[in-house]
Every structure is written in structure tokens, then in C-alpha cells.
Amino acid sequence: MTFKRALAFMLLAVTVLASFAACKTEEKPVEETTLDISGYTIVKPDITSNDITETISNFKKYLLSYTGAELKVSSDWYNPTQTLDESGYEILVGNTNRTVSADAAKELEATEDENSFIIKVTDNKIVILGKNDDTTRRALKYFLVNYAKTVEENSKTVNLKKGHSEIKTVTSDSIIFNNFTEFETILRSTVTAPESKWAIGTYEYPTMIQLRHNGKHNGTLLSTLESGDAGYRIMKSTDDGVTWKQIASVKDYLNNGYVTTWMPFLYELPVDIGDYKEGTIILAATSRNKSSDFDISTITLYVSTNQGRSWKTICNVDKAGGLSWGVWEPFLIYEESTERLYCFYSDDSDPKHDQKLVYKYTTDLKTWSELKECVACDDPALRPGMISIAKMSNGEYAMAFEMVGISGAPIYIKKTKNLDDWGPVSDYGQPVKTAEGITFGSAPWCNWTPAGGECGTLIVVGKHPVPYANTEEGAKMLISFDYGKTYVAIDNPIPYAIYSDSRCGYSPHLSFSEDGSILYYMNNPEYGVKYSCEYIELVKIKITGMDD
């Protein structure tokens, strides 16, 4: 009995130890935190807007860039005589005919907010659905930023797991484009305005710079504008545009008997030029003779070496006679490769052309080159004018100008890679318009920033819609993400009305922060009774691309 009892105890002990050993080595299954999407297809509704189709194409491109997964795109069409096969692995964008899309749509309908979207994952489907095209676009961007951009490169996965479901409400009032770039208005302020809304006066043609070459003063904003014959007001902001104060008034003391009247343009020297150090502020403008027939006009330069507090007149770039024979609308730009400062402007003085676009350049701010043409039309009645130029990252300069003499004074852009070579002067480039034909005319401005996409963002603004008619809406703002090959239109961030007695929208201005992420947009909407005068308004817009 003793031996049998001992053997029984030994067997029991072995069994218990084996049980403990089994408990110790048993492991729970690892929960998957990523989803392999390499075998998925992106599926969209058979009837889809062009905008969403383009957005899905960009979505596919970014998925490849972030995850390494190159997916096909197809529509949800199927032969109605056959049973719909829902067994495939699919990313469903929008309200497709798949069962899980319908289920997700019902969940989304339960939310009252129209700015909502849903992302839902089942065994073989990922649903990305918004209540409208705008929220679907935001849902796709949210998916990319939060679930695709966060994985290991070339992993062909996203940071999602089966069973995931979330509904989000968009809280931003930003504009989102098909390439997922967003424009968000972050500030509106008044730069300067009349003392009374019953006033009659001129508040137009604003330009602005953000100081970048003035040491501790960098970031300061300086602005100027047309304000009659009283001189060019210099407005200053040290809080990035929230508040403004006048610090100077610039007058012409070089040309005896001339008044400072029209078209001021501010520029900060990026390098030393002649006797003038990097950071010197230049104001270029048109002065005119006081005589009743305005018989002489000049392109005159003024400089400030103390951040705009005081000024002196240094030279005339050009001089010509009369309202019908004058020189107007100067624009300054420095070309690093040639170390030249260029002054582009409109010239009425050639009897062979009603008006043409010309330029001179200098390397010392004392002597200027001979006058050269960049646009001089074969039709002598045409009047190209109001130049602005933006340098883009592809090495091209884009020059925007109006073409008075064609109905509506439409805006054109001509390009070059060399400021001293614009090709045939009779070639005036391409019109600025969307694929739908949306365009504008008169008083253009263009500028470019690296923010917003692979090719950066080119922005063009003008005064009035084309075809032109008295309207309660000013011109749209046109945006290009491909160096000016194509454009999309958005509502003007500074709304204004256009009537025959209104000067609103003449002339808008675009500039950027040093890193390009902030757009400073200035214009002159109506202020007085019956549009007797305007005021200068600033809007700051934050530009955010997928990789910004």
C-alpha cells in the first residue's frame, strides 16, 4: 500500500507540474494594429464629380508615397444581370453601391452636422464617406495624415484594424482643394480707412512687405497705398497685421513741382546694391507734374535706411510726358544670378504702341540700362499694363498683366527663366482662367509660394469678373498648383462690389511670410456711402499642404 500510495503522489505531482508549465508557456494571440492594404482596390461611385475623381487620384498618389502600396482605382459599376460580388478587398470612397457603404451612410445620417464624415473598417472593406464632396475630401486627408503617413515606409500597411469605426465633425472653415492643400483665414484687419464713412477720397493700390533683412526688426510689416496727392503713407505693424499705425509720408523732393500721386510699390533689398545696404527699403512710384495737363510723369525711387521712418528721393528710372504719354505702375525684382535689380513698368511714350511693358535694370542704383521691351503687341491699340512678377521653384518667372483693349481687360501670364529675355515681345502668354472659363480682368497681381503642394502655389487676383458687368460680386481668386498650367477659382477672401462709380478692387496685393506658409492679401473694399471711397483691408491666410 505504501509503494502504491507513493507512486500515486508522484504521478499527481508530475501532472500538476505539467499543468503549471503549460500555463506558463501559453501566449495570447497578438492583436493586429495595422492593416495590409496591398491587395485592396480603391472604388468610387460610377457617377462621381470631376473634383472628387481628381481628389481620389491624389489620394492614390499619397498612399503610394506614404505606404508603398500602389492601388488600382475602379468604379462600383457592375452588370445588373449578375449578382454583385462583394468579396474583394476594397477602399470605398463616397457612397458606393456596396452594402457596407450603405450601412456607413445610415450611421452618418444619424449625425445632424452636415460637416461630418465616417471611416469604417470591416473584414475586407474600408469605407471613407463624407456628407458631401467637401467632407469626403477632408475624410480622405484625415485618413492619409492619421493612418497612412504614420506607418513605416514601404510597409504597405495603414494604422487601422478591423472593426474600427469613427465619425468626425469638421470644425475648420478652411477651403480644401483637390490636392488636400488648405487655405484657412486666420486674421482680418483694417490697415487704414477714412475718418468717416461719408468721406470722399482715394484708398487704393496697396502694397506690403514683411521685413527679412533688418535684424531685430525682421517680421515687421510695412504697407503703402495711393491716397491722392498727400504723399504715400507708410503704415507699420509690429504684431503681424493685427494693428497698424502711420509712421511716415513720402513725398517727391527730387522733381521740383511734382506730386506723389500714383502706384506706389515697396521693396526690401535682399543684398547690398551700390551704396545701399541689404535691408534698405525702396519705394517706387509715379510722380506727376502739377500742371493742369499733367505734361510729365516719372518713375521715381525713394529709399529708407531706418525701416520706413524717414525717406529720401534718389533717382528717376524714367520720365515721359502726359497722361497719354506717361510711365506707370513700377514693379521691382532682384535677379540673384545676374546681381541686377530690375524695374518693370508700363510705358505710354512710344507712338507705335498705345502702351507696352518695358524694363530697365541697375547694379548700383545710380545708372540704369537702356529701356527694353517685354510685351509690345502687334495691334497698336492694345494696352498691356500693371505688371507683377513671381519667381517659382521650377526656375520660371511668371509675369501677370492686364490687356486693355480686349473686352474686359483680361489677365495674361507670360513666363521666362531669364528676366532679360522674354522671347518675342508680340507674344503675351496665356490667359488666366479655369477649365470652366472662370476668369477676371484689370488690375492683376500674382505671387508664388512653396507651400501647398509639390509645385507650390501660384495665386492670381484681379479687379472684376469677365465678361464685365455691374455686379455685386468682385473677381474670384485663382489658384494654380502646377506653375500656372491650370487654375481653380475660389471666392474672394475680401468681398467687394463692382459698380461704375466704384474703385473697389484696384489694385489687390499678394505677399507671403518668409517661410511661405502665410498669405498676406490686401484689397480695398467699399467703405463710404454709395462707394464714395474705400478702405484698405488685410486678410491673413494660412496655407497647409500634405507635407507642410
Say what each PLM segment does.
Residues 17-33:
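Sec-dependent signal peptide cleavage junction
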Residues 10-18:
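Bacterial N-terminal signal peptides
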Residues 1-10:
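Bacterial N-terminal signal peptides that target proteins for export
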Residues 21, 108, 342-343:
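Secreted/extracellular small peptides and ectodomain modules produced from precursors
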Residues 29-178:
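Solvent-exposed alpha-helical segments and adjacent loops
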